[in-house]
Design a protein with these regions (language model features):
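Long, hydrophobic/aromatic-enriched structural stretches that serve as scaffold segments
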Residues: 1-2
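Sequence-level detector for tyrosine residue identity
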Residues: 6, 11, 31, 37, ...
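Short, glycine/acidic-rich hinge or "gate" loops at secondary-structure transitions
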Residues: 6-25
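Extended, solvent-exposed, turn-rich assembly/linker loops in the middle of proteins
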Residues: 25-104
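Sequence/fold signature of self-assembling virion shell proteins
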Residues: 92-222
Length: 222
């Protein structure tokens, strides 16, 4: 699941999926999202700047993403990005004359009403090597439809390909039933012919097959 989530997040935040060199061949899949569906803010327009207009940005991007007949209903972002948005002066201005208690729920609902989309905060974490990082990166906002965005496709890993080509040598690899995934036990250290430690290596290769290439928008906002 972690691999699938990470691959999906890479696609949704960059329109690319890059596989680690160790078990994914170091390859990058570029889905070639049209330039009109991407924007990188700079200078006084980044959302951390007082001069930014994040609500107008979101409305403008929604219009662009819907030009070809699609319907964009969700603004996807990390928790840090949403916090930056809701603390911006243009958002605070929405509550200047309010007499009710301003709660986080009210702030989110008000922003959603203004931009015409639901804000979805993706705050999942993943461990890559020894580093824990966000599955969906900060400073990126992706507008998407509500519903199925495509499917996840599974394929043979480099190890499985070696097996199919008869190039495994003396490596002992076991298939996980019903999948392209493999399990390999690799000796990590040994002395006097006795194995002291082993690594159990499970490989899996999964990529998104999206159906939203003409109804999404990826913005880098900081």
């Amino acid at each position: 699941r972690a691999i699938a989530s990470y691959a999906a997040a890479q696609f949704l935040s960059t329109a690319k999926v890059t596989f680690p060199n160790k078990n994914g061949g170091g390859q990058t899949i570029n889905y070639k999202l049209a330039d009109k569906y991407k924007e990188t803010l700079a200078g006084t327009n980044i959302w951390s700047a007082a001069t930014a207009k994040p609500l107008e940005d979101l409305e403008r991007w929604k219009e662009i993403a819907e030009e070809d007949g699609g319907t964009v209903e969700i603004a996807l972002m990390s928790k840090a990005t949403f916090n930056m948005l809701k603390k911006h002066d243009t958002v605070k201005e929405l509550f200047k004359n309010t007499t009710v208690t301003i709660t986080p729920t009210l702030v989110k609902a008000t922003i959603e009403e203004v931009i015409g989309m639901t804000i979805l905060v993706w705050n999942e974490k993943i461990k890559v090597g020894k580093i824990t990082k966000n599955v969906f990166p900060d400073n990126v906002v992706t507008l998407i439809p509500n519903g199925q965005l495509g499917v996840m496709e599974y394929g043979p890993t480099p190890t499985k390909t070696d097996e199919l080509l008869g190039m495994l040598g003396d490596r002992d690899v076991v298939d996980i039933a019903g999948t392209f995934s493999t399990v390999e036990v690799v000796a990590e250290s040994k002395s006097a012919g006795v194995v002291n430690n082993v690594n159990v290596v499970i490989e899996d290769l999964v990529v998104p097959n999206p159906s939203i290439m003409d109804s999404m928008f990826i913005a880098t906002v900081g």
